[in-house]
């Protein structure tokens, strides 16, 4: 029995998750993600480092494109195997991968415009929406705690990762000599604890080898009451008859904020307020959440049993086309506008910021990390003027920040999850982390006598049990 593990992405970086497990002649890819942002300076999405025709299965931990985003490219290049995932992951991939295809086409179009007439070869997107549709036909779905056979002597079990809807910790069991099994656990992304809607990550697992994410291996999340903080912000703006703009992720964070706003509005703590979700993508994803209520935590299920849909309330409006979106630009008061994505110099968010930042009764709530040169960072630093699409905008509105909504476990959460294992793994491979985060968490684990490796790109290791 020969078992090897090769790291094809998310090594000393946080995108491009892809790890090749070879068991004798069978090849199983654990995630197949896109490299994004700064990681594209070092890695190329069209260099796969494995022949898709030789891969038998892709085991997908969750739908985020840094874990799923190259799957359509694999099919385009000859992959004929199966993608194994949970049902919500498949449905969410339908939205997120098509969105990724559209973004690629737009970026390629503008890049080719800049290349025109310079004698430089035109680029092509990695895949299009038709490629996504074809790929989705080969997604096979399973629930948590089911045994999934990947051929003789290999099985997979999904456990709830608590990161996003349908996210999974992947247990891979491989029949060894005699009656023994080799167990590899791949965490995907481990969720933060005590979040709304989702369960906490399943703990107390056991494995011989562990591939562990380390996104926030050197960070502790704020221990503040998210409800109290958001309620204070909403009341501050609504009592002044202003608008609150909230740029945030379409998947996960938008639904968490809707859930909290539902609590405020249905309890009467906030009155006379309209909430607009200005994102067709977020609207579609919220419908998927409603479809898979069995994946919710006990508190959310209890609300539903009482007849309260926690993702719907009077005054909640989903914007599903550009015409409706333009109408929101005219909204002047007592409205919360949730916009997909980050604080960018373009698109819907730029229009909302332009309309509301010059007004002292309005505000913007930032809920995620902002890069040093970003517009969001400039707002947090208190800049009184920002430039949006070439226009100088005076900032008179309020700027708020909430750091307690992360979907990733922090340093303590990661360590608590690892230390809940019944026995120490023989080896831990730390991935999906960079710089101080991965180094600090490595030191923490080693100080507790764990055997830890930080793999480099394309490193390969035998998984041997003596």
Task: Set out the residue ranges of the language-model regions.
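Cap/insert and terminal regions of metallo-dependent hydrolase folds
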Residues: 82, 169, 191-278, 363-368, ...
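Core dinuclear metal-dependent hydrolase active-site scaffold
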Residues: 1-53, 134-199, 323-331, 336, ...
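Active-site metal-binding loops of divalent metal-dependent hydrolases
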Residues: 10-11, 32-35, 88, 164, ...
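Metallo-beta-lactamase
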Residues: 100-164, 293-332
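Hard-cation-handling environments
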Residues: 233-372, 387
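Short secondary-structure boundary/capping segments
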Residues: 99-103, 107-111, 226-228, 261-264, ...
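Short helix/loop capping segments that flank catalytic or ligand/cofactor-binding pockets
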Residues: 16, 38, 68-69, 94, ...
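Pre-active-site segment of Zn-dependent metallo-hydrolases
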Residues: 11-16, 23-81, 85-137, 190-200, ...
């Amino acid at each position: 029995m020969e078992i090897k593990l090769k790291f094809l992405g998310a090594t000393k970086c946080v995108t491009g998750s892809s790890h090749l497990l070879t068991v004798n002649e069978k090849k199983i890819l654990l995630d197949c993600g896109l490299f994004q942002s700064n990681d594209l300076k070092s890695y190329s999405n069209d260099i796969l480092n494995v022949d898709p025709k030789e891969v038998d299965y892709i085991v997908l931990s969750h739908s985020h494109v840094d874990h799923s985003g190259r799957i359509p490219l694999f099919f385009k290049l000859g992959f004929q195997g199966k993608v194994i995932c949970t049902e919500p992951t498949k449905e969410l991939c339908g939205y997120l991968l098509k969105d990724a295809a559209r973004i690629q086409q737009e970026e390629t179009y503008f890049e080719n415009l800049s290349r025109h007439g310079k004698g430089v070869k035109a680029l092509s997107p990695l895949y299009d929406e038709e490629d996504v549709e074809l790929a989705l036909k080969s997604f096979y779905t399973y629930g948590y705690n089911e045994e999934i056979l990947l051929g003789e002597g290999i099985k997979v079990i999904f456990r709830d990762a608590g990161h996003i809807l349908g996210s999974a910790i992947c247990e891979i069991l491989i029949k060894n000599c005699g009656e023994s099994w080799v167990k590899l656990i791949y965490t995907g992304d481990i969720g933060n604890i005590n979040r709304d809607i989702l369960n906490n990550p399943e703990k107390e697992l056991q494995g011989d080898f562990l591939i562990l994410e380390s996104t926030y291996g050197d960070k502790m999340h704020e221990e503040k009451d998210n409800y109290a903080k958001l309620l204070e912000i909403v009341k501050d703006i609504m009592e002044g008859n202003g608008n609150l703009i909230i740029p945030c992720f379409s998947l996960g964070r938008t639904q968490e904020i809707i859930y909290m706003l539902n609590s405020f509005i249905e309890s009467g703590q906030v009155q006379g307020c309209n909430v607009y979700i200005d994102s067709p993508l977020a609207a579609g994803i919220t419908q998927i959440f409603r479809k898979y209520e069995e994946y919710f935590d006990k508190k959310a299920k209890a609300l539903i049993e009482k007849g309260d849909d926690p993702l719907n309330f009077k005054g909640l409006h989903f914007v599903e086309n550009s015409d409706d979106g333009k109408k929101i630009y005219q909204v002047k008061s007592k409205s919360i506008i949730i916009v997909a994505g980050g604080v960018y110099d373009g698109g819907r968010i730029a229009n909302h910021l332009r309309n509301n930042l010059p007004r002292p009764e309005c505000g913007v709530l930032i809920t995620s990390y902002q890069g040093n040169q970003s517009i969001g960072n400039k707002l947090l630093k208190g800049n009184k003027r920002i430039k949006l699409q070439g226009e100088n905008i005076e900032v008179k509105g309020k700027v708020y920040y909430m750091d307690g909504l992360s979907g990733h476990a922090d340093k303590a959460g990661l360590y608590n999850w690892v230390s809940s294992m019944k026995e120490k793994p023989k080896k831990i491979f730390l991935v999906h982390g960079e710089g101080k985060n991965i180094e600090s968490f490595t030191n923490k684990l080693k100080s507790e006598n764990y055997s830890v490796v930080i793999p480099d790109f394309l490193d390969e290791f035998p998984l041997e049990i003596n």
